[in-house]
Amino acid sequence: MTARLTRRPGGPARLRALLDSGQTIVAPGAFDPLSARLVEEAGFPAVYMTGFGTSAALIGRPDVGLLTMTEMAGHAGRIAACVDIPLIADADTGYGNPLNVIRTVGAYEAAGAAGIHIEDQVAPKKCGHMEGKLVIPAEEMVQKVRAAVQARAQPDFVIIARTDARAVEGLERALQRARMYHQAGADALFIEALTSEAEAEAAVRAFPGVPLLFNWAEGGKTPPISLDRVKELGYRIVIFPISTLLAATGAMRRILREIAQAGTPAAAMSELPTFAEFVDFIGLPQVREAEQRYAVGTGPRTGSQTGADDGGDI
């Protein structure tokens, strides 16, 4: 993997091609650009921008609907700009009614996301594995999905409809809602917080040929089913939204404890990348190359390049 200074175009088309290939897309969660780069370095075909992790990273607060659409789309743009793999992003409830959803789709597309999921929770929403969720009427969500599908400028931009109704209305009603959302034009479905492997299997059986997303969340309501089994069941997208966030939190706690107790992180240095390795990873060689390429005096100078239109000094 080589660090880029600009975003690679065509994310929606590449995500659509992955969906059309029949393979299961494994997309670990990223909570910032650095974690997204690590997902890419590990060889995954796509990355997922976690709303839970974004809320924790940006404002240090839980995922309870505190972030705005512009904050979320802006964060998606920063992540998309630093990786070559497609970005699937959490777009919460779409941030309002169908008119708001139209603006949301445009903002995430402009940011460089390859696809988004929107959910049928009442705003302000909660993390899908928290208690106390409420859902809007299914017919209202249908209009949001229709608006999202019709608003996208790129036909390949992937719209994933998520239902949180399992925890509120039960599995059968959640499946009914998901069917309505698919009929409204959603490209894929996300039935959140299933409570057993049997429910996960039932969801796939209910939608033959329709891409379904499986949410593998540590400590959540869905049991820890192996990735091989999730693939065997037929899920087409698998996200691990908080794995990197929890791992980073644990690692930072360990190093901070070492500094607090020993006065130095020396005991943990063998587990850390070196400074040189880290700056190479985040793209310093590419920055240096660009500095040399565009350094003053390395190429012909014209009035327009120097800012002078008469050949004089500026």
Language-model features and meaning:
Residues 24-25, 265:
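A general structural signal for well-ordered secondary-structure junctions
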Residues 6-18, 25-214, 220-235:
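Alpha/beta enzyme core
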Residues 20-22, 241:
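Short glycine-enriched loop/turn motifs at secondary-structure junctions
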Residues 216-303, 307-314:
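C-terminal alpha-helical cap/extension of soluble enzyme domains
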